[in-house]
């Protein structure tokens, strides 16, 4: 289970500040 990847995908749908720290732009 790749949590970071899941967060990144969710961020593409609904961006949030936490995503910028975890995922590349």
Curated annotation (Swiss-Prot):
Keywords: Antibiotic, Antimicrobial, Disulfide bond, Fungicide, Membrane, Secreted, Target cell membrane, Target membrane. Its main location: membrane. GO terms for biological process: defense response to fungus; defense response to Gram-negative bacterium; defense response to Gram-positive bacterium; disruption of plasma membrane integrity in another organism; killing of cells of another organism. Coiled coil: none annotated. One of its GO terms (cellular component) is other organism cell membrane. The keyword Secreted applies. It is found in: Target cell membrane; Secreted. Disulfide bonds join 8-23, 11-19. Antimicrobial peptide active against Gram-positive bacteria M.luteus (MIC=1.6 uM) and B.subtilis (MIC=3.3 uM). Less active against Gram-negative bacteria E.coli (MIC=63.3 uM) and yeast C.albicans (MIC=24.2 uM). Not active against S.aureus and P.aeruginosa. Has no hemolytic activity against human erythrocytes. Probably acts by disrupting membranes of target cells. This is Panurgine K.
């Amino acid at each position: 289970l790749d949590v970071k990847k899941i967060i990144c995908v969710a961020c593409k749908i609904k961006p949030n500040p936490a995503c910028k720290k975890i995922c590349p732009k």
